[in-house]
Amino acid sequence: MVVLDNYYSNRNNYSKVNVIDKENRKEMEKLIKLRSVRLTEPLTEKSRPSSFDEIIGQKEGVKALKAAICGPNPQHVIIYGPPGVGKTAAARLVLEYAKSMENSPFKKEAKFVEIDATTLRFDERGIADPLIGSVHDPIYQGAGSLGVAGIPQPKPGAVTKAHGGVLFIDEIGELHPIELNKLLKVLEDRKVFLDSSYYSSEDPNMPTYIKEIFDNGLPADFRLIGATTRNPDEIIPAIRSRCVEVFFRGLKPNEIKEIAKEAINKVGLKVSDNGLNIISRFCSNGREVVNLIQLCSGIAINEERNYITEEDIKWVIENGQYTEVEEKKVSKKPIVGVVNGLAVYGANLGILMEIEVTARKMKGRKGELKVSGIVEEEEFSMNNKKIKRKSTAFSSIQNVLTALNNIYNLKCDEYDIHINIPGGIPVDGPSAGIAIATAIYSAILNKPVNNKIAMTGEISLLGMVGVIGGVNAKILAAKSAGANKVIIPSGNWNENFLNYKGIKVIPVSNIKEVFNLSILNIEKSDINILSAKTNKK
């Protein structure tokens, strides 16, 4: 009987091995066949930057990234910027550049591990966590090779795989708060501690390496590079405080043209300068450019042409429902009640914001104030409470009216005043204070404003000009829009502003200085207007 039992047991084992072997050969043949089939390389791959010189328009951002990663003490980094401007490409290149530096701690074998926060999922039971790591659970996931013996099986996550290198988390702003808190702990400890109810330090059957992992943790000494399209204030302060913040800006039309030209050259086609101009008007980032050119090149190749026509570009734009990127420019001549304000949107992108005001003297009744184009109310949560208040932009307008009354005795409530900020994007923030004050002052006194001056700054009830944020981006936006002077708060002044070419940066501390610089046909001496009525022509 024993002989028969052994015979049938060996026969069954042989049959199982034979079946597994046949299945293995069959699947390997399928896999080899699949791998032998390859399509042509897409243009998105061909046009991907292979060196920092190919990252267009991000000279300052790349310089900051190199300074943070390529020194003897590399830092954790968060890169802010709009989509398709080179954040991911720069992150991929910076590790290879750091390896070439003599004083860099990154070894030649240092790995670049990339993970996308938008698709990152984890299990609350701790049995699946591709970022931090997990422990195989024999109940939920099957026994596995060691599960029969009751031995837990640790699975390293991305933080351990990136040990000694760089962990790149794309769209880090979308990372789940629980995962983010786990990541913060790993950044502090530089190791990962796992836990399992199956682990016992007294178990003599426990393999040494598993005991070492549970007792002393998995190594996770890496440098984090996160990329996000969110604003800094939308990122949890705990992660921001541990990282150097690097900003990539939006691309200018001439930079879009350069990217388009390079992409077209890589597919072996030609295009006219006017065609490049059209592309630069309808694309705002490199990804949009490449997608548009892929379709245009497809049309040209199907029609057996070696060039892309303007009609090809226009057809793709029309069918792809591309929206023209409006480039804000200063007005051609001074206008009463129209002022060039400045704002910041997205990730440190500056924009010229035309503010227009009309004022009409009322008789027999009080005037009315109308405001359009701004956020009037805002709601936010704080300490488990929902708080609703007037927006900072609307409050800034109230400050302006009070300041004009206090300083110049302008009775704004005697006028029907309409303040409008065109553009279709609701505006918030106090930094348009001096621009709104100048526009109201101009409209009431019927005096034009210098159209070549742009301005930004908060205004107090006493007419003092307060500091604001995003000054560098605003100055560049003013220059790009055609302004030759930009007024900023004196508290934001930096000696580096003297190095800007093509635009003069003027610091001011009170609203009188602003009016003296911007209102045309106005005496340069101290102004003491007693009544708006007596001064209006």
Question: Each predicted region: which residue ranges?
Answer:
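Walker A/P-loop
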Residues: 69-120
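AAA+/P-loop NTPase substrate/partner-engagement loops
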Residues: 100-134, 139, 201-203
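Conserved AAA+/SF3 P-loop NTPase catalytic/coupling segment centered on the Walker-B
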Residues: 122-132, 154-188, 195, 232-241
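Conserved C-terminal helix/linker of AAA+ ATPases
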Residues: 293-294, 299-329
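Conserved catalytic/switch belt of AAA+ P-loop NTPases
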Residues: 136, 140, 178-217, 237-238
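Pre-Walker A (pre-P-loop) alpha-helix and adjacent loop at the N terminus of AAA/AAA+ ATPase modules
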Residues: 37-80, 400-405
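Peripheral, non-AAA+ core regions of ATP-driven protein-machinery
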Residues: 339, 361-537
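Conserved C-terminal "switch" segment of AAA+ ATPases
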Residues: 101-107, 232-238, 245-307, 407-414, ...
